[in-house]
């Protein structure tokens, strides 16, 4: 078990040493050997400015992996793309539609730029979370832009083809542009990920990157894919941006040679997911096992639950209130760690639940 260092790691260095960090979405596993080798080889070579359009082979590999034909532009990361899209397609004071609970930078990209959050809560059913299509229809008239997350962070839902097709119909009826964050797309379990752009190619901007799947968040890079006019609109809000040469080398190695590492990692993540689900069920906590991502969204009996567990269990989790109003009894737990770490964290959480 080779854990990240306490210094130089946001996840492991933010809290005191007696705290187990299961919060920010980093894995504790080292990246694939092929990625490490590609980085070492690139570091011995040219590190100057690359072409603005980036690595051509990498562009083709990304499109092939998603099964899409689209314009593609590199950017410093998916969150940058969210901010740029909000700036490109809305004006201050206007509303931006999204599903809640939602990854906090979605809300920040809207509020930081003086737009209004139009929150459409996911429906919780006995089978898990579902899109509230009726709610989406009611709110769609008030905006031009929908920010979508698929697979969904924090619930781990991988939306099905029927839901995606229905969302596409609503977008067409209401003249919506949809920005779909599909950063976790390869991290699915039983249910495969299907890009929203398969159903709405003319109105979808897809955001992707290697950071979550291959544990490369410290090498920030992403890409926006979609119709050329929409991609060009986003690029106007990414002035003077060049893709990172080391990040491109890592991403290309991941797509070409990272398959065996990803398969083994998904096996461990699936086992961890099932362990957390069994634990939550045995304790009577509200939880639906994620269909994708390595994140567990858990409802507890406690207000300000993350603060409670940090104090009582010395386990750092993401606070539910960061993902939207009304979720302070929830926590997001990152289970992308070694079984020994996860078991110790669950043991500590058990003590706080008694």
Curated annotation (Swiss-Prot):
It is an enzyme of class 4 (lyase). Its cofactor is pyridoxal 5'-phosphate. InterPro entries: Aminotransferase_I/II_large, Class-II_PLP-Dep_Aminotrans, PyrdxlP-dep_Trfase, PyrdxlP-dep_Trfase_major, PyrdxlP-dep_Trfase_small. Keywords: Amino-acid biosynthesis, Lyase, Pyridoxal phosphate. One of its GO terms (biological process) is amino acid biosynthetic process. GO terms for molecular function: cysteine-S-conjugate beta-lyase activity; pyridoxal phosphate binding. Activity increases by approximately two-fold in the presence of GCBP. It catalyses: L,L-cystathionine + H2O = L-homocysteine + pyruvate + NH4(+); an S-substituted L-cysteine + H2O = a thiol + pyruvate + NH4(+). The modification N6-(pyridoxal phosphate)lysine is found at residue 212. Pfam families: Aminotran_1_2 (PF00155). Its EC number is 4.4.1.13. Belongs to the class-II pyridoxal-phosphate-dependent aminotransferase family. MalY/PatB cystathionine beta-lyase subfamily. Catalyzes the transformation of cystathionine to homocysteine. Can also use cystine or S-methylcysteine as substrate. Interacts with GCBP (TTHA1554). This is Cystathionine beta-lyase. It comes from Thermus thermophilus (strain ATCC 27634 / DSM 579 / HB8).
């Amino acid at each position: 078990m080779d854990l990240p260092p306490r210094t130089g790691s946001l996840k492991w260095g933010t809290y005191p040493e007696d705290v187990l960090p299961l919060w920010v979405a980093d894995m504790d596993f080292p990246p694939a050997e092929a990625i490490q080798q590609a980085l070492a080889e690139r570091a011995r070579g040219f590190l100057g400015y690359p072409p603005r359009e980036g690595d051509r082979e990498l562009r083709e590999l990304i499109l092939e992996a998603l099964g899409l034909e689209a314009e593609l532009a590199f950017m410093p990361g998916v969150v940058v793309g969210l901010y740029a899209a909000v700036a490109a397609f809305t004006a201050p004071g206007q509303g931006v539609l999204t599903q809640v609970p939602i990854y906090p930078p979605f809300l920040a990209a809207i509020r930081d730029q003086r737009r209004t959050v139009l929150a459409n809560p996911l429906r919780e059913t006995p089978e898990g979370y579902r899109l509230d299509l009726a709610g989406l229809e009611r709110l769609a008239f008030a905006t031009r832009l929908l920010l979508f997350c698929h697979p969904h962070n924090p619930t781990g839902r991988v939306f099905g083809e029927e839901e995606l097709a229905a969302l596409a119909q609503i977008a067409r009826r209401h003249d919506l542009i949809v920005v779909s964050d599909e950063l976790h797309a390869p991290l699915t379990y039983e249910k495969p990920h299907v890009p929203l752009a398969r159903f709405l190619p003319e109105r979808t901007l897809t955001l992707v990157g290697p950071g979550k799947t291959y544990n490369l968040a410290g090498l920030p890079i992403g890409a926006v894919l979609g119709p050329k006019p929409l991609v060009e609109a986003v690029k106007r809000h990414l002035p003077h941006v060049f893709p990172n040469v080391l990040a491109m080398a890592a991403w290309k190695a991941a797509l070409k040679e990272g398959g065996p590492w990803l398969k083994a990692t998904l096996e461990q993540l699936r086992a961890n997911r099932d362990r957390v689900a069994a634990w939550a069920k045995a304790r009577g906590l509200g939880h639906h096992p994620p269909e994708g991502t390595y994140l567990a969204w858990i409802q507890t009996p406690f207000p300000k639950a993350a603060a409670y567990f940090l104090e009582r269990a010395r386990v750092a989790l993401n606070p539910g209130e960061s993902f939207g109003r009304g979720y302070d009894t929830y926590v997001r737990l990152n289970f992308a760690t070694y079984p020994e770490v996860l078991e110790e964290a669950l043991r500590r959480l058990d003590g706080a639940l008694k």
